[in-house]
Swiss-Prot record:
This is Cytochrome c-type biogenesis protein CcmE. Belongs to the CcmE/CycJ family. Heme binds at H130, Y134. It comes from Pectobacterium carotovorum subsp. carotovorum (strain PC1). Residues 30-160 are periplasmic. Keywords: Cell inner membrane, Cell membrane, Cytochrome c-type biogenesis, Heme, Iron, Membrane, Metal-binding, Signal-anchor, Transmembrane, Transmembrane helix.
Length: 160
């Protein structure tokens, strides 16, 4: 192989290796910013047929309804604890900060944070639905057939 061909081959290999490295580093950086959406029952029992549960420490978003009577505020700080439920289960959410003005018991909510235990989320952000006629598509699909009421087992404080 002649010298110019070797030089050209090395240059092409260097460009390909650089492109592969760039793509790999970009995908690695983006993976830490992905927040998967779960309903309370998917956190407890896993998603669909795969029964894949989120791992402890995983960043995620949970959507559902705020259980009436579950909101507890700390008198010494901005910490708020509440329960988010859907048709098959409920999870506890802890949030330290100012809640949105439209946050209410019995309303739809999406909490973004880290799964602390099997049924507890430490939220970094809480979003409340902003219009009485609007429900985010993820929550609407998860709550279908439930008519906005907590199932009896959930309202009695049982984990389904």
């Amino acid at each position: 192989m002649s010298a110019p061909r070797k030089t050209r081959l090395y240059a092409i290999l260097a460009v390909i290796c650089g492109a592969v490295l760039t793509v790999a580093l970009t995908l690695y950086a983006l993976s830490s910013n992905i927040d998967l959406f779960y309903t309370p029952s998917e956190i407890l029992y896993g998603k669909n047929e795969t029964q894949e549960k989120p791992a402890i420490g995983q960043r995620l978003r949970v959507g559902g309804m705020v259980m009436p009577g579950s909101v507890r505020r700390d008198s010494q700080s901005l910490e708020v604890r509440f329960t988010v439920y859907d048709a098959q289960g409920s999870v506890e959410v802890t949030y330290n900060g100012m809640l949105p003005d439209l946050f209410r018991e019995g309303q739809g909510v999406v909490a973004q944070g880290i799964l602390d235990t099997d049924d507890h989320i430490m939220a970094k952000e809480v979003l409340a639905r902003h219009d009485e006629n609007y429900t985010p598509p993820e929550i609407k699909a998860a709550m279908e057939g439930q008519h906005g009421h907590a199932p009896a087992a959930v309202t009695e404080g049982k984990r389904l």
